[in-house]
Amino acid sequence: MNLAIEAPRVSLSRGDSYGAGDLYLQPINLGWNTKHADVIAWYGLFGPTGRYAPGANNNRGLGMWSHELALGSTVYFDDKKTLHASALGAYELHSQKKDSDVRVGQLLTIEGGLGTTLKQALNVGMAYYLQWKLTEDSGLGLPPLVENRLGKNRNFGLGPEVSMALPLSKDFSKLMVLTFRYLWETGTRVDTKGNILAFSLTFKVH
């Protein structure tokens, strides 16, 4: 994990560190299902358990507590649920960073996609994300690169996504889901910019 570049502190130095990062807990996760829509809501907490020192180039964590509130839904356009669209909004609030006066601004992230299901196991479509920093970063000792352009960052991304469900039991009650996503970023303001390639592996065991 390379955290030489982190928000809101931007560093041009390089450094790699290997080990456990910050802890993420989701003590509240609620879901509702209807014939043509699924809804989910949760509260998540990021804890600063990864090693962090202000200005270091080998940090494994971000050195701050973060609270996450999220609400999302998937809407199905036919009875067989083969055509669907989704959107998930998450709001993040952050504490001051460890041993520092720096506080990262509050973030709003919206992500989702539009897709279709083929042969019950393969999903293909387009994914997107939108992210805005709604309040300015604050604190002492910010580098000159950003000290006059604090906060109000934004990033947008759009690209293809493919996922495949592989059954681990005959009745499909246990699944392994492989997901591939590639996003082109655009509309970036006061932030680093680059395309995103992501793979994920999810297990459903009940």
Regions found by a protein language model. Give the residues of each.
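Outer-membrane pore/translocation modules
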Residues: 1-104, 149-153, 203-206
